[in-house]
């Protein structure tokens, strides 16, 4: 055994050995417990960042631990390879997106291997490969045949620079989040999948997900947004038209004082024909569409259309206003406004001096509507025959009357909208539909799949290469001219089923092999950032149910247990330029001065020795130039050190603060473990079966207490940082242990053997090497997790503290099973106890078993 720990030499040797021994190749083994561990696959942007490293280290630690517990483990890896960044990079680098993407994949694959992650590379997939997306296209055509896919014109946020549709959340202050261009409103035909058909099941099945964080489930519940209410028809005065609205508060119907309609509503369009001022306002509303989340905080603007609606109960005429807070995409694009009992309606009514009519007396008695709306429920007032009813009673009574009159009905509503999957981009999966000359659309026949994306293209930054290529667009359908759809899928499509494709990634004649898919699915452990709590995780759950209903999988849900890791933070530094802007400086270019407590007291630029400003801890990002390159850290410290720091610095779901001193501390710990093993190997032999003295028994007790704690922390609790802390504490005990006798060496050998196995999932390279140095032949990856020897935990003796009148006077070692009487006898035989009790009246003796004996004397 080498005396010095050499990470780079050990790590390259171990990685080569794992590859040669095919250690991580997963095969179906019916009858054996399986464990499918999956970390969210990366976008191949060019290089891994520390957020990736944290995510994938967590997954690898869990996978390796489960393998040592005897499970049949699968841990695959692939690439979420489509998306706009590849197009932007292609334009910038004058290359094709495909070439840029595949080069990045090759580089990042080697980065992952250098970190020692135990992936089954035979299952590797890239979503930009036709072998992958052909099945996505096939599945889409099957959904179309089932009536779950449809095409409709939809008003979209159009970015005129990126030439693409933006989600509401991608519009910031009326501008595109990526390009900064002023966003326009545009109506274009788009393809949708009916996720709303599954809204109830998606909501109900959240209750099955015991292994998911409550926060994520709450976010999905809110996004799906189930509500019970009533749909009500308001007649339009002097017209045959009706305004249909949905409300969850029919008990406030008598408080309606105006109606609000979206700028795109037909009534608004009609009124604008004869009202230029209204037409101008509507145009402004259309071009300032914002995310739904912003509506609560933005200024409420509106204009009277001059049209009146008729109250369904009182016959009163109510003004109809165009309001910028009403969205055409939600419900019917119209709302009934009750300003006394809805804060948004109250703000609008106050601004435009519309009537505010209270119809609920709150239970709290606070009924001042001058300051704000009263949103709580209570007793109905000013509502004719419903006065005196509770809100719940009035809900039922009013809903019943509306139904009897034929102008309303109860309805369960969902906030969730159907999934618009069309994107006006090139680098994505072509939507497998054909547009015929008669205006109809039909699926591409199965024998013509996949519809391949041409990869050898030149990006001009304006038009999609497939849109501007007539040869690609043109085709035939039943002998008639047709054109390929030139939109591509939302990239959430690819990431909604990749976890299932891993189960049979090499199958080329089907989307999934049901037998293999049903063996591995559902995923036992899924790991990724909480930023994916809604869209990706919701779409993947939806897709899984679609796969089930197509007969490809049997389970209802894709992921049993979900772990959302926290962000990685790092110190940031900057200098101010002449205009007061911040020029961010990489931490690698800064020399740091620390105070006595280790906090940063000052910083200087390495190049010129001049001070730089300290920007504090923030998420690692390009914008603040505070990212730490994982490759640099692996080359400097070794992969095991980086992995150990990542797992030790914080609980997995909390933010992790990068610290060079913390990384150095992690390496010192590994060097200590190496040194101790070296000393044991050079100390002479050790035979098992030696009788042990009290100190040796105590060391074994510490070992097996640690095994018990680490087993629970690594498995049930997933508190890896406390598991590592316990192992570090154990190593402190082991370093103090003598090596003189065979019994000493026997206990130390057992302890190091178990320590190496406990650390193996976290620092696999050094542990594999130490495992060999300890004399083992089989790979550590297939060794058993250390078992707790319950007999070692049984203590022969206990240390008892003796207090006399509240002061510690003696410490006794007594047999572990000693009775209170025996402990008292031993205590009173002690000289120190006799000294403080002699000639005094012993008034009371209180014994806390195994801990303390209190004696009160007078």
Swiss-Prot record:
Annotated region described as Disordered, given as residue ranges: 602-631
Gene3D superfamilies in UniProt: 2.20.28.290, 3.10.20.590, HUPs, Isoleucyl-tRNA Synthetase, Domain 1
Residues folding into a coiled coil are none
Question: Which UniProt keywords are present, listed alphabetically?
Answer: Aminoacyl-tRNA synthetase, ATP-binding, Cytoplasm, Ligase, Nucleotide-binding, Protein biosynthesis
Residue positions binding ATP:
622
Matching NCBIfam families, A to Z? leuS_bact (TIGR00396)
What this protein is called in its record is Leucine--tRNA ligase
What organism is this sequence from? Idiomarina loihiensis (strain ATCC BAA-735 / DSM 15497 / L2-TR)
- Which taxonomic lineage is given here? Bacteria, Pseudomonadati, Pseudomonadota, Gammaproteobacteria, Alteromonadales
């Amino acid at each position: 055994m080498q005396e010095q720990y050499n990470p780079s030499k050990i790590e390259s040797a171990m990685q080569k050995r794992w590859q040669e021994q095919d250690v991580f190749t997963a095969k179906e083994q019916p009858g054996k417990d399986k464990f499918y561990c999956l970390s969210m696959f990366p976008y191949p942007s060019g290089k891994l960042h520390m957020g990736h490293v944290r995510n994938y280290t967590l997954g690898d630690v869990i996978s390796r631990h489960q393998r040592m517990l005897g499970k049949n483990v699968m841990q695959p890896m692939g690439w979420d390879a489509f998306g706009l960044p590849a197009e932007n990079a292609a334009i910038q680098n004058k290359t094709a997106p495909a070439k840029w993407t595949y080069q990045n994949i090759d580089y990042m694959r080697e980065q992952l291997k250098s970190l020692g992650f135990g992936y089954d590379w035979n299952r590797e997939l890239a979503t930009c490969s036709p072998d992958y997306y052909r099945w996505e296209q096939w599945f889409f055509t099957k959904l179309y045949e089932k009536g779950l896919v449809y095409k409709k014109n939809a008003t979209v946020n159009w970015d005129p620079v990126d030439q693409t549709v933006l989600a509401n959340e991608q519009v910031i202050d009326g501008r595109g989040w990526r390009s900064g261009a002023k966003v326009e409103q545009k109506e274009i035909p788009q393809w949708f999948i009916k996720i709303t058909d599954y809204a109830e099941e998606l909501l109900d099945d959240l209750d099955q997900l015991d292994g998911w964080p409550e926060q994520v489930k709450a976010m999905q519940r809110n996004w799906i947004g189930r509500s019970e209410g009533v749909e009500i028809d308001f007649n339009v005065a002097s017209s045959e038209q009706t305004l249909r609205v949905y409300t969850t508060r029919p008990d406030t119907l008598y408080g309606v004082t105006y109606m609000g309609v979206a700028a795109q509503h037909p009534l608004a369009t009609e009124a604008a024909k004869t009202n230029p001022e209204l037409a101008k306002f509507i145009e402004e509303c259309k071009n300032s569409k914002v995310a739904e989340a912003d509506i609560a905080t933005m200024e409420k603007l509106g204009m009277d259309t001059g049209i009146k609606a008729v109250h369904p109960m009182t016959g009163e005429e109510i003004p109809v206003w165009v309001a910028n807070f009403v969205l055409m995409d939600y419900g019917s694009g119209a709302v009934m406004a009750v300003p006394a009992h809805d804060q948004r309606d109250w703000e609008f009514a106050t601004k435009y001096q519309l009537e505010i009519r209270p119809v609920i007396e709150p239970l709290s008695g606070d009924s001042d509507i001058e300051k704000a709306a009263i949103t709580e429920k209570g007793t109905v007032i000013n509502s004719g025959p419903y006065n005196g009813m509770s809100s719940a009673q009035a809900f039922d009574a009013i809903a019943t009357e509306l139904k009897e009159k034929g102008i309303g009905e109860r309805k369960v509503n969902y906030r969730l909208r159907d999934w618009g999957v069309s994107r006006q981009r090139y680098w994505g999966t072509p939507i497998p539909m054909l547009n015929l000359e008669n205006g109809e659309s039909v699926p591409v026949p199965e024998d013509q799949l996949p519809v391949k994306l041409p990869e050898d293209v030149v990006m001009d930054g304006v038009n999609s290469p497939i849109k501007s290529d007539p040869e690609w667009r043109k085709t035939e359908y039943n002998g008639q001219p047709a054109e390929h759809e030139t939109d591509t899928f939302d990239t959430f499509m690819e990431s909604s089923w990749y976890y299932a494709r891993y189960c049979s990634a090499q199958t080329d004649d089907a989307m999934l092999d049901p037998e293999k898919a049903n063996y591995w699915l559902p995923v036992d452990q899924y790991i990724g950032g909480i930023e994916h709590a809604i869209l990706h995780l919701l779409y993947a759950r939806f897709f899984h149910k679609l796969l089930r209903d197509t007969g490809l999988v049997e389970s209802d849900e894709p992921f049993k247990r979900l772990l959302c890791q926290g962000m990685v933070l790092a110190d940031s530094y900057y200098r101010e330029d002449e205009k007061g802007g911040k020029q961010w400086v990489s931490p690698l270019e800064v020399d740091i001065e620390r105070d006595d407590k280790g906090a940063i007291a000052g910083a200087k630029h390495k190049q010129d020795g001049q001070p730089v400003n300290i920007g504090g801890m923030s998420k690692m990002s390009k914008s603040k130039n505070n990212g730490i390159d994982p490759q640099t850290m692996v080359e400097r410290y070794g992969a095991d050190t980086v992995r150990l720091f990542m797992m030790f610095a914080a609980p997995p779901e909390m933010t992790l603060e990068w610290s060079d001193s913390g990384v150095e501390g992690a390496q010192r710990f590994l060097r200590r473990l190496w040194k101790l093993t070296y000393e044991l190997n050079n100390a002479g032999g050790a035979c098992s079966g030696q009788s042990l003295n009290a100190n040796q028994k105590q060391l074994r007790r510490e070992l097996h207490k640690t095994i018990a704690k680490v087993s629970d922390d690594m498995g049930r609790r997933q508190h890896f940082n406390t598991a590592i802390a316990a192992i570090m504490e154990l190593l402190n005990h082991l370093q103090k242990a003598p090596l003189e006798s065979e019994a000493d060496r026997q206990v130390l050998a057992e302890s190091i053997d178990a320590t190496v196995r406990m650390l193996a999932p976290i620092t696999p390279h050094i542990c594999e090497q130490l495992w060999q140095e300890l004399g083992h032949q089989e790979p550590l990856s297939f060794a058993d997790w250390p078992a707790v020897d319950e007999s070692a935990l049984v203590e022969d003796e206990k240390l008892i503290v003796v207090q006399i009148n509240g002061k510690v006077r003696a410490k006794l070692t007594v047999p572990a099973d000693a009775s209170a009487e025996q402990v008292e006898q031993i205590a009173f035989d002690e000289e120190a106890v006799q000294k403080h009790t002699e000639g005094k009246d012993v008034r009371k003796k209180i014994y806390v078993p195994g801990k303390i004996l209190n004696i009160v004397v007078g």
